[in-house]
A protein has these predicted regions:
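Non-transmembrane, membrane-proximal soluble domains of secreted or membrane proteins
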Residues: 62-90, 111-318
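Hydrophobic alpha-helical transmembrane segments of multi-pass integral membrane proteins
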Residues: 46, 50, 92-108, 135-148
Length: 318
């Protein structure tokens, strides 16, 4: 063999060998990058799981009002709220499991079917078994969600053997409350201005001048409507969020257990209703039956004739 040809052959062989080494190195580097990406992604997944499933942790909001950095819902108080939180936890676990499975499949597909691993991609157009699976499984998941969802919906909608009725009327931008079972007195509830709230140590944008007062251990019917535009009476601790619609009556119910006597629960209007929508807080104070009866006696004197026209002056008969 000519020396020059032999040298060329050796160089070509060396180049091929180097090409194989470079190809293997690139593949290893790609694998390493994927592994590093997964390792970097793993703490994020753990953090997401902690956030999603941490609804029973120590960062839960205090009873009746939101707290800074809270996770999950406020502590449930009413029977509807307890069932609602169970449903919320079920949905959280389902969403977490589905998200993890989809993400794992996505990472697997990115690695297993990359261009380097599959220079000639598959031309498969359909897969009967796979199509049946990804049709049936979502249907089953929806059924798992629908059954407790409808149970909760009808449980919140039923009003049986109500001990007390509270009428709620939304107005721009305050609430009016009526107590038809206790003399039919009426009063308005407006937000305390921010300067006064800060000066007196009250909850800014949450405390009101006349809170709703409700007795504990009583089934309470809530009837809502509006005097102008659509409002929404939302009370997270009681799991109530119901529209107040002009010309229509919406109804729900609640029950506050006895251990919450003395607690004030806060909520807000949750339907955009105009320029001062953010200044329509709701405050509900739970009291014992004895305290409620004493408050009713006082409220009847204070509010019973508040909306009646002034008496007409007449001339003396003498």
């Amino acid at each position: 063999m000519h020396p020059k040809k032999g040298m060329i052959h050796q160089v070509t062989k060396a180049q091929r060998g180097w090409g194989r080494v470079r190809h293997i190195a690139l593949r290893c580097n790609a694998r390493g990058q994927i592994r590093m990406s997964i390792k970097k992604l793993f703490p994020i997944l753990l953090l997401g799981l902690a956030v999603l499933t941490g609804v029973d942790g120590a960062a839960i909001a205090a009873v009746g009002q939101p707290e800074p950095w809270q996770l999950g819902l406020q502590d449930p108080v009413s029977p509807v709220a307890v069932e609602g939180q169970k449903f919320f936890n079920l949905l959280t676990w389902l969403m977490t499991i589905i998200t993890v499975i989809v993400l794992a499949l996505l990472l697997y597909v990115l690695f297993r079917f990359s261009a380097k691993r599959n220079p000639v991609p598959s031309k498969t157009t359909h897969h009967t078994l796979l199509e049946v699976v990804w049709t049936v499984v979502p249907v089953l998941i929806l059924l798992v969600i629908a059954i407790p969802s409808f149970r909760l919906l009808y449980f919140a909608d039923r009003v049986e053997d109500a001990d007390l009725t509270l009428k709620i009327i939304g107005k721009q931008w305050y609430w009016t409350y009526e107590y038809p079972d206790n003399g039919n007195f009426t009063f308005d509830s407006l937000m305390i201005d921010q300067e006064t709230a800060v000066a007196e140590g009250l909850n800014r944008l949450l405390d009101v001048d006349n809170p709703v007062v409700l007795p504990v251990d009583q089934n309470i019917r809530l009837i809502m409507t509006s005097d102008d535009v659509i409002h929404n009476w939302a009370m997270p601790s009681l799991f109530i969020k119901l529209d107040a619609v002009p010309g229509r009556l919406n109804e729900t119910w609640t029950r506050i257990p006895g251990e919450y006597a003395g607690t004030t629960f806060y909520g807000q209007c949750s339907e955009l209703c105009g320029v001062n929508h953010a200044y329509m807080p709701i405050a509900v104070k739970a009291v014992t039956m004895e305290e409620y009866e004493a408050w009713v006696a006082k409220a009847q004197e204070e509010f019973a004739s508040a909306d009646l026209p002034s008496a007409v002056s007449v001339a003396s008969a003498e």
